[in-house]
Amino acid sequence: QEWMSSLMRPSSTLSAGAFFIGVWMAFLAIINILFGAYSDGRRVNWIDFFTNGADTNSAHDVTLVFPDDIVFILLSSLLIAAGAMGMGATREDGFRGWLSGMPRERVVTSTFSTENGLGRTFASWMIVAGAAYYLMWSTLESTWVDPGVYSVMISFVMVGIGLNWIQDAKLES
């Protein structure tokens, strides 16, 4: 029964992931409404895009498209809220404490110092490199939903996160 209760407790890792993915989705929704997130400034029709429908993109005009943009914004809001609530439940200082303490987290401070080891510095820079690649490519090419760019970006980011977790495991043992 103990293993069952551990599965039902909120996870700070899962909460942080939900929060960051929700923020990223909200960012994409704003880009899609203002400029179009698909290539050549076209807008993404989110429902068809995720279900592999026939009309994954359309000509851009600065308006909300119902239900696509509304559903995507609601989904991003739910992920942000779930992440904030989960983080609030897992930490004594709550969500605000986690958010305000983020600049002092080992992953962030290791981008500017080797104090926590060269492995963690390398891991942190992998995360930065992945995010920078995605932002630069998407800005220069005006396409924010390119699967090839995602695959390169997520490879860098997840290897960086994984290497940071390995460093955390070394500290615990």
Residue ranges and their predicted role:
Residues 5-26:
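Alpha-helical transmembrane segments and their helix-start/interface "positive-inside/aromatic belt" motifs
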Residues 17-21, 117-127:
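Select subsegments of transmembrane alpha-helices in polytopic membrane proteins
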Residues 29-53:
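Membrane-helix interface motif
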Residues 51-74:
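Membrane-interface segments at the starts/ends of alpha-helical transmembrane spans
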